[in-house]
């Protein structure tokens, strides 16, 4: 995997690690050294049960060379996890994303999303009832910022950094 990361990073693409099953923190370390700059959707895209000490979440929280991207939509992560990220990770390394996709902005109902059946609930939860799992997100980034402000206690300036400035810096646009 580090060879692949190195080749992709050499093209100027920002490489982010996520929705993966690294076998060890060493595998993650090798990818960071090879050019990976972030962790995608930290806390999601991993098995429901992971090793309680040796897992990507802990590794990402202490890896100073990579940003931590997360989805603060009120569905993907509990408030306790959002608070942990806000307290454990330096502000400059945090990047909030909405991950909003089809059917964002549409009324509650049944939809086909990336080939999977999905139900969009009135509260914005997009999930597959048969598999009891999330199928994506529909919450706009502005609402994600309100969640971080109102439920986690971040300031408007911190939210702007996490929801805008840090993302631009991550892709070298700031």
What is the predicted function of each stretch?
Residues 169-174:
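Short arginine-rich
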Residues 156-167:
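Short, well-structured alpha-helical segments that form the helix of a local strand-helix-strand
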Residues 4, 17, 25-158:
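Active-site-adjacent C-terminal substructures of enzyme catalytic domains
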Residues 1-7:
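Active-site core of PLP-dependent enzymes with the aminotransferase class I/II
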Residues 8-19:
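Short beta-strand/loop segments at the ligand-binding rim of alpha/beta enzyme cores
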């Amino acid at each position: 995997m580090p060879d692949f990361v190195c080749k992709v990073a050499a093209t100027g693409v920002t490489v982010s690690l996520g929705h993966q099953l690294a076998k060890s923190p060493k595998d993650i370390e090798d990818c960071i050294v090879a050019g990976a700059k972030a962790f995608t959707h930290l806390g999601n895209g991993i098995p429901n049960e992971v090793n309680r000490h040796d897992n990507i979440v802990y590794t990402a929280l202490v890896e100073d060379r990579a940003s931590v991207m997360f989805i603060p939509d009120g569905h993907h992560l509990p408030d306790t996890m959002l608070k942990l990220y806000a307290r454990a990770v330096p502000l400059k390394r945090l990047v909030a994303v909405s991950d909003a996709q089809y059917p964002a902005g549409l009324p509650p109902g049944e939809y086909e999303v990336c080939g999977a059946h999905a139900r969009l609930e009135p509260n914005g939860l997009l999930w597959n009832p048969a598999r009891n799992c999330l199928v994506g997100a529909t919450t706009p980034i502005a609402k994600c910022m309100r969640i971080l402000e109102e439920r986690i206690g971040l300031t408007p300036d911190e939210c702007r950094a996490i929801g805008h400035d840090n993302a631009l810096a991550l892709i070298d646009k700031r």
